[in-house]
């Protein structure tokens, strides 16, 4: 039986897969440039990065299933960055405060025979209006580090979420339903 390689350094994606009894045999993060192309919209951006990550890792593991994903947080057409510092985290929170935004998840699976499956999942999230004190406290928490859009819904930021429409696991980092459908469709048996 072919092994499943998770092309991600995200511990959240690994935890999500384990939640549905999928245990990757190997974790091999892809290192690709995640900078949006000029004029690139959120959905094509998430798709492109998921596929680029899968292709980058598949070459190192012939005969394996390779699963990659990318998560993008967007306000309108604007792609928010992964927060790398408190200032960026705060800027993201200011944009998200009191607004609805989208979390777009791109998923790509490459089968041992070279077939490629792709899915894109969009979840709508609405934040309550945040006070300056709430933004400062969240920024000081450090929980935003490396997170798309500068927040982690599975942590402290959950208290700011007024409404979710769509896949919760997509917001965390990997839509489990679509991932399971891809794996099942390609004959992967956990």
From Swiss-Prot:
Example GO molecular function term?
Answer: dTTP diphosphatase activity
Residues at the active site = 70 (proton acceptor)
Gene Ontology cellular component annotations, sorted alphabetically: cytoplasm
Localized where?
Cytoplasm
Q: Which Pfam families match?
A: Maf
The cofactors required by this protein are: a divalent metal cation
Give the family this protein belongs to, as stated in its UniProt record: Belongs to the Maf family. YhdE subfamily.
- What is the name of this protein? dTTP/UTP pyrophosphatase
Species of origin:
Paramagnetospirillum magneticum (strain ATCC 700264 / AMB-1) (Magnetospirillum magneticum)
């Amino acid at each position: 039986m072919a092994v499943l390689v998770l092309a991600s350094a995200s511990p959240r994606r690994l935890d999500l897969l384990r939640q549905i009894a999928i245990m990757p045999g190997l974790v091999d993060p892809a290192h690709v440039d995640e900078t949006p192309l000029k004029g690139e919209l959120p959905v094509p951006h998430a798709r492109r990065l998921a596929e680029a990550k899968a292709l980058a890792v598949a070459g190192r593991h012939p005969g394996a299933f390779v699963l990659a994903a990318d998560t993008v947080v967007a306000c309108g057409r604007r792609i928010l960055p992964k927060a790398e510092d408190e200032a960026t985290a705060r800027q993201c929170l200011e944009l998200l405060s009191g607004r609805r935004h989208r979390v777009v998840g791109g998923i790509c699976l490459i089968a041992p025979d070279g077939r490629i499956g792709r899915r894109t999942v969009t979840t709508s999230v609405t934040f309550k209006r945040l006070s300056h004190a709430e933004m400062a406290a969240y920024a000081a928490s450090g929980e935003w580090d490396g997170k798309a859009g500068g927040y982690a819904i599975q942590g402290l930021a959950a208290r700011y979420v007024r409404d979710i429409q769509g896949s919760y696991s997509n917001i965390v980092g990997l839509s489990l339903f679509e991932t399971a459908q891809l794996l099942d469709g390609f004959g992967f048996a956990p």
